[in-house]
C-alpha cells in the first residue's frame, strides 16, 4: 500500500508526519474521499476549526461537510448556550445521527465539543418532522413540536430556532437551514413553502419540502419532565424541590441554563463518538492533547467552585444555590476519551518527523517566509517572485494564497510587475490543477503559512507581507458579561441605546418566572431603576466624558430621544455638506497625474489590516 492508502484503510492509530498546517487539510480531504463514511477532524479550538474548515472548502468543496460546535457558555453556567449555537449543535447531531454511514461526510469540530455528552443518538435521529405543499399538517401539532423541541416563539423570525404564527401563516427558522421558511396554510392543508430573507422578509425561493429538526438537545415533553423531576430529587434530595430550575421544568417551562442538567432529561447520554460510529476516522490537531487537559481541568475547577459555593445554601449575590451535577455525568473523562479514540482508526497530524512503525511521512514542510528580506529592507516582492519562479522550474504546481479576492488581485498585479507570469485565478484546488502547467495560480485561501510538498507549493500572503493585524468585530456574548461588567465599577456612567445616560450600580440576580436571571442594575434620574438582562449588554456603551457634571436622563422621558434626533440631524447636515463638496470637486478638472506602474499596488499590498466587508 502507498502512504495515502495506508492512512485511509488502516484500522490502527497512526501519526501523520510531515503535515504542516494547510497541508493537513489537503491530506484529510483525500482520506475522507478515499474512505467514504464519516471522518471527524478535532481541532484544538474554534479558531483552528474555522481555518481548517475554510481550507477544506478550497481543497474539497464537493465533499459533504459540517461544523459541530461546543456550547458558547462556561461549564456549570447559569445561562444557556446562545440559541444560534444550540441550534447549530442540535442540527449537526441530527444530521450525523441520520447519516447512512456510507457516503463521505466530514465533521469539523473541537475538543470542547467532543468532550460534551449529547442527547441520545436515537432521540436526535427520530426527532424531525417534514412537510410539503399539498400535504396535511395540523398547525397545533406543529406548534407543540416546535415548543417542545427548543424553538422560541417571537414576533419576527430572525435567528435559528425562532418561530412565529400569524393566523394561517407560520414562519420558522429551522436548525440547519440557511434561511427561515414561511408556511401558508388553508385550514390544515399546507399550500406553499417559501424561504425568505429575515431582514427584508421577502421570498427568496419556493420549496418543495421542508424538514424541522430539534434546536435543543432537551425535548420538553411529559416523559422528559417526569425523568427530570425524579432524577433531580434523587440526586439532590428533598431540598432540591424548591430549586427555581426544578420548579420551572415542573411547570413545563424551559428555564435559562437548563442544559447544564441535560443528563436528567434523558435515560442516558451518548457522545459524539457514538454518533460518528465505530468505523469513523478520527483525525487530531497537534494541540488537541494540551487543549483536552486544559478543558478537563477547567471543568473540574468550575464544578468545585459551584460545589463549595453550594455548601452555604445560596449562590453569589443572593442567587439560589446551584446544584451542580458531577462532571462525569456531562463530560467525558480522560480514560473515556482515550478509549473512544483507541476504538476507532485515528490519525494525529504533526509537521515534524517521528520515528516508528506507526508513523507515516507525507513529505510536507512549511514554506519559506520572507521575514529576513522584510527586515533587511529589500524588495520582498522581487524576492517572492524569484522564489515562485524557482519552485515552478523544479516541477511544482505553485499557488499564491491570499485572504480575500481584492488582496489576491493586488498580489498578482505586484508579482507580475516583478516578472512573475502568467498568474491566473482559480476558484478551488481542482481548478488550479487544470491550469496550464507553467501558470501560477492565485487563489483565495486563508492560510497563515504556506507549505511545500514534492509536487505542490503554496505561498501565503502572510509569508510575503508578514502577520496580518486582524481586528475582527465581535458581538459581545452573555457568557462574557462577568468579564465586561467586571471592567466597570459601581458608580460608572453608561449610555443605554434606548434610555440614555444612567449610572451602573452593579450586577444583581432577579428571580423571574421562578428562574434566576443575572441583570445589570442601572439608576436614572429620580432614583428610577432599570434592570438590564446580561444577554442584552450590547445595548450599553461607556460614557466617554467627565462624569462630575453629567446629568442623568429621566427613565421614560423625552430628553434622550430629542438629543438623539438632534444628533441625527447634525449628521445629515454634515452628509449634505460633504455631498456638496464632492459634487464641486467632481465638476472641476485638472491634469491627470499617473503614478509609476505598479507602485500603488505595492503600497496597497503592504496594508497590514484585514479588509472590511
Question: Which residue ranges define each predicted feature?
Answer:
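Conserved beta-alpha structural segments and adjacent helices that either
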Residues: 1-549, 567-592
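Conserved pre-motif I regulatory segment
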Residues: 2-8, 594-613
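Actuator/coupling domain of P-type ATPases
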Residues: 550-561, 565-581, 598-604
Amino acid at each position: 500500500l502507498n502512504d495515502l492508502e495506508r492512512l485511509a484503510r488502516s484500522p490502527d492509530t497512526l501519526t501523520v508526519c510531515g503535515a504542516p498546517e494547510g497541508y493537513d487539510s489537503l491530506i484529510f480531504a483525500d482520506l475522507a474521499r478515499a474512505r467514504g463514511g464519516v471522518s471527524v477532524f478535532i481541532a484544538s479550538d474554534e479558531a483552528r476549526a474555522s481555518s481548517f474548515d475554510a481550507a477544506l472548502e478550497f481543497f474539497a468543496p464537493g465533499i459533504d461537510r459540517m461544523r459541530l460546535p461546543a456550547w458558547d457558555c462556561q461549564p456549570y453556567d447559569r445561562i444557556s448556550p446562545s440559541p444560534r449555537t444550540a441550534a447549530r449543535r442540535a442540527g449537526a447531531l441530527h444530521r450525523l445521527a441520520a447519516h447512512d454511514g456510507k457516503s463521505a461526510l466530514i465533521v469539523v469540530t473541537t475538543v470542547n465539543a467532543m468532550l460534551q455528552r449529547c442527547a441520545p443518538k436515537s432521540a436526535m435521529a427520530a426527532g424531525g418532522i417534514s412537510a410539503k405543499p399539498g400535504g396535511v399538517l395540523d398547525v397545533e401539532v406543529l406548534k407543540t413540536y416546535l415548543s417542545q423541541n427548543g424553538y422560541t416563539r417571537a414576533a419576527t423570525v430572525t435567528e435559528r430556532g425562532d418561530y412565529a404564527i400569524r393566523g394561517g401563516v407560520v414562519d420558522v427558522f429551522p436548525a440547519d437551514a440557511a434561511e427561515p421558511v414561511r408556511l401558508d396554510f388553508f385550514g390544515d392543508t399546507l399550500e406553499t413553502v417559501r424561504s425568505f430573507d429575515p431582514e427584508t422578509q421577502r421570498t427568496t425561493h419556493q420549496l418543495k419540502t421542508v424538514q424541522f429538526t430539534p434546536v435543543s438537545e432537551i425535548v420538553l415533553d411529559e416523559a422528559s419532565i417526569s425523568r427530570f423531576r425524579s432524577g433531580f430529587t434523587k440526586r439532590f434530595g428533598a431540598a432540591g424541590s424548591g430549586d427555581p430550575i426544578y420548579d420551572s421544568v415542573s411547570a413545563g417551562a424551559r428555564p435559562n441554563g437548563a442544559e447544564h442538567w441535560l443528563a436528567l432529561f434523558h435515560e442516558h447520554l451518548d457522545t459524539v463518538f457514538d454518533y460518528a460510529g465505530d468505523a469513523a476516522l478520527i483525525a487530531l490537531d497537534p494541540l488537541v492533547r494540551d487543549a483536552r487537559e486544559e478543558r478537563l481541568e477547567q471543568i473540574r475547577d468550575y464544578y468545585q467552585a459551584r460545589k463549595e459555593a453550594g455548601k452555604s445554601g445560596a449562590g453569589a449575590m443572593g442567587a439560589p444555590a446551584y446544584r451542580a451535577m458531577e462532571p462525569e455525568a456531562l463530560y467525558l473523562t480522560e480514560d473515556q476519551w482515550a478509549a473512544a479514540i483507541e476504538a476507532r482508526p485515528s490519525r494525529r497530524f504533526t509537521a515534524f518527523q517521528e520515528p516508528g512503525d506507526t508513523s507515516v511521512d507525507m513529505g510536507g514542510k512549511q514554506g519559506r517566509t520572507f521575514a529576513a528580506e522584510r527586515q533587511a529592507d529589500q524588495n520582498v516582492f522581487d524576492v517572492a517572485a524569484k522564489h515562485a519562479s524557482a519552485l515552478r522550474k523544479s516541477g511544482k504546481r505553485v499557488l499564491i494564497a491570499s485572504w480575500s479576492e481584492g488582496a489576491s488581485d493586488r498580489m498578482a498585479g505586484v508579482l507580475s510587475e516583478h516578472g512573475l507570469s502568467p498568474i491566473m485565478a482559480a476558484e478551488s484546488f481542482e481548478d488550479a490543477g487544470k491550469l496550464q502547467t507553467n501558470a501560477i495560480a492565485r487563489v483565495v485561501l486563508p492560510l497563515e503559512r504556506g507549505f511545500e510538498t514534492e509536487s505542490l507549493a503554496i505561498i501565503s500572503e502572510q509569508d510575503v507581507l508578514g502577520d496580518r493585524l486582524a481586528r475582527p468585530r465581535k458581538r459581545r456574548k452573555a457568557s462574557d458579561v462577568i468579564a465586561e461588567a467586571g471592567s466597570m465599577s459601581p458608580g460608572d456612567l453608561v449610555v443605554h441605546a434606548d434610555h440614555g445616560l444612567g449610572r451602573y450600580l452593579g450586577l444583581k440576580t432577579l428571580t423571574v418566572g421562578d428562574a434566576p436571571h443575572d441583570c445589570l442594575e442601572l439608576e436614572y434620574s429620580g432614583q428610577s431603576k432599570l434592570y438590564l438582562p446580561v444577554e442584552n449588554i450590547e445595548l450599553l456603551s461607556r460614557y466617554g466624558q467627565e462624569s462630575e457634571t453629567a446629568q442623568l436622563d429621566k427613565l421614560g422621558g423625552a430628553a434622550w430621544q430629542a438629543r438623539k434626533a438632534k444628533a441625527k440631524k447634525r449628521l445629515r447636515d454634515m452628509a449634505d455638506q460633504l455631498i456638496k463638496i464632492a459634487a464641486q470637486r467632481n465638476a472641476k478638472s485638472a491634469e491627470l497625474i499617473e503614478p509609476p506602474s505598479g507602485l500603488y499596488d505595492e503600497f496597497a499590498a503592504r496594508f497590514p489590516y484585514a479588509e472590511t466587508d
